[in-house]
Amino acid sequence: MVYIINMNTILNALAEPNRLQIVELLRDGSLTVGEITDKLGMNQPQVSKHLRVLSEAGLVEVQPIANRRYYKLKAEPLKEMNEWVQSFQKLWEDRFDRLDDYLQELQRKKKNKRSE
C-alpha cells in the first residue's frame, strides 16, 4: 500500500506542467533556483514553491554548495515509477496481440469473399 501512496504523490507532483518542466530541466543536471527561473521565465517564489512540492514528493534533493543551493533529481522515485509503468506492459502486449489476430482474421475473410 505504501507503494501506491508514494506513486500517487509522485504522479500528483508531476501532473502540474511547470513542475514537469522543472523535472525535464533537472534531467540534464543540477540547477539553482535562479537558473531554473531564467530558463522557465517564472518568478523565484513560484519556482521555489514548485521545487518544494517536488522535494516533498521525493523527486528532487537539494545540495548546498558554498552560498548556493543546487537542485537535482533523485533517481529512485523515477525508477519506481518506470517499474510501475512497465508492470502494464504485459497487458498492452496481450491486447496488441489480440488486435493483430483480429485484423489478420478480417483480412482472411476479405480474401475469401474476393475469391468466391
Protein language model regions, located:
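Short, Lys/Arg-rich nucleic-acid/phosphate-binding segment
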Residues: 64-70
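Pre-recognition alpha-helix immediately N-terminal to the DNA-recognition helix
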Residues: 20-22
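Short, hydrophobic-biased segments on the C-terminal half of alpha helices
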Residues: 51-52
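Short helix-coil-helix linker/hinge
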Residues: 13-18
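C-terminal regulatory/oligomerization modules of transcriptional regulators
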Residues: 1-8, 25-39, 44, 56-61, ...
